[in-house]
Swiss-Prot record:
It is found in: Membrane. Residues 1-22 are annotated as: Disordered. It comes from Bos taurus. This is Small integral membrane protein 8. The chain crosses the membrane at residues 48-70.
């Protein structure tokens, strides 16, 4: 009996060392103009700078929230002057209350 030749088994070879450098956008062929306009796509991320930026933006948002909260508290206050000339802060009252 003749046996049919066995089909070659497809072996998945591990990627070669030179192929690993072509992962992501760094391996895509682009023009020099595109790389000059979009350098952040091709530069390795700098984690300390990213952490500094995240902390800075978080502090800015917290400060804006703080200013908003203090402005809301001051909105209902006005400076009143008594008969002796002393000024003090007084909460606004409505005639309808």
């Amino acid at each position: 009996m003749s046996s049919a030749p066995e089909p070659p088994a497809f072996k998945k070879e591990p990627p070669k060392e030179k192929d690993l450098g072509n992962i992501g956008l760094r391996g895509v062929r682009t023009t020099t103009l595109f790389r000059a306009v979009n350098p952040e796509l091709f530069i390795k991320p700098n984690k300390p700078v990213m952490a500094f930026g995240l902390i800075t933006i978080s502090l800015c948002v917290a400060y804006i929230g703080y200013l908003h909260a203090t402005q809301e508290n001051k909105k209902d206050l006005y400076e009143a002057i008594d008969s002796e000339g002393h000024s003090y802060m007084r909460r606004k009252t409505s005639k309808w209350d």
